[in-house]
Design a protein with these regions (language model features):
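Structural motif corresponding to the C-terminal cap of alpha-helices
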Residues: 102-106
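Conserved SAM-binding loop and adjacent beta-strand
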Residues: 83-100
Length: 113
């Protein structure tokens, strides 16, 4: 596991999310969802997001590295974006979301033992 790659991925994801958040005038969590959609299908007019998504793909992150990058991103979101008590994530919900994201973002031929 390469912590520099995790830090780079976190930085790219955060820049993308904040750029989308400003462009769409939405909250951090909605912008994060849009960032993931733009990363997966490549449809965006935002040059920063295109460039950062390309750099993210070039990093070739493992599932564990994706998990850690998103874990830090969710921690940042929790610090900057207040949630109502009824909308806060439970540990199980966070686990399900991160597992889903890893399955979508990681290459299917990678296997960690």
């Amino acid at each position: 596991m390469n912590f520099e790659k995790i830090e780079q991925a976190y930085t790219y994801l955060l820049e993308n999310t904040q750029s989308i958040q400003n462009e769409l005038s939405t909250n951090f969590y909605d912008a994060l969802i849009e960032q993931n959609a733009m990363y997966l299908n490549g449809n965006t007019d935002l040059d920063l997001v295109k460039n950062n998504s390309k750099k993210l793909k070039e990093l070739g992150l493992s599932k564990e590295e994706w998990r850690r990058a998103y874990q830090f991103l969710f921690m940042k979101a929790a610090q900057t974006e207040p949630l109502q008590a009824n909308h806060q994530f439970t540990p199980d919900a966070i686990g399900f979301i991160i597992t889903f994201l890893i399955d979508q973002l990681a290459k299917s031929d990678q296997l960690d033992v």
